[in-house]
Amino acid sequence: NIDYACYAEDVYVGYRYYEKAGQPVAYPFGYGLSYTKFEYTNLLISDRQVTVQVRNVGNRAGSEVVQLYMANPQDGTYRPLKELRAFEKVFLQPGEGAMVTFLLASRDFAIYQDGWRIPTGTYAVLVGSSSADIRLSQQVIVEEEKVPAPAWLAGSWYAKPAGQPSIGEWRHIMENLPAEAKDAEPGSFSE
């Protein structure tokens, strides 16, 4: 009787796993159908503000979900290749354009390893209509702190995910499994 879910894949859930493992998918994360076409231009990054021009170049009015991903440095710390950081839906008439603005926060660059830390490295700001349909990108160099890879990472499933991780490898991340869940009794609550 298992009363909890073990997400041993950790940060590699959904599109993050498939991209890191190099596995193709039929419908990438963020995929959607539209009756028109959109063009992305003029990606600008100033300080932590990201702007992009989106134009409806089709013959019909339509909506587009503009998605901003952050491509992480792959220098030893275990991280997805890219992560969704923001999105905005715009509705545009044929020929109409809109400037979409995103603000990057420090947490968009951070990992949790003995607290929130921002690793030094080259990141890429990616803008597109899905995780697989990236239209524009621009590199950003971040000078923060050198975050060493955990000693257990080398050679583990998390360094190069494929298939499923073992519970033993998962324990290295979690330090120990969750406590056994107890059967709930009507009228009782945990603190």
Language-model segment annotations:
Residues 1-63, 69-70, 120, 125-128:
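Secreted, periplasmic, or luminal enzymes acting at the cell surface/secretory milieu
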Residues 47-49, 97-101, 135-137:
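Intrinsic-disorder/low-complexity, polar/charged segments enriched in Ser/Thr/Lys/Arg/Asp/Glu/Gln
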Residues 58-62, 94-96, 132:
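Short flexible coil/turn linkers enriched for glycine and charged/polar residues
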Residues 61-68, 80, 111-114:
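Short, hydrophobic/aromatic beta-strand segments
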Residues 76-113:
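Intrinsically disordered, low-complexity Pro/Gly/Ser/Thr-rich segments with frequent PxxP/GP/PP motifs
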Residues 105-152:
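Terminal connector regions
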Residues 150-188:
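Compositionally biased low-complexity segments at domain edges in trafficked proteins
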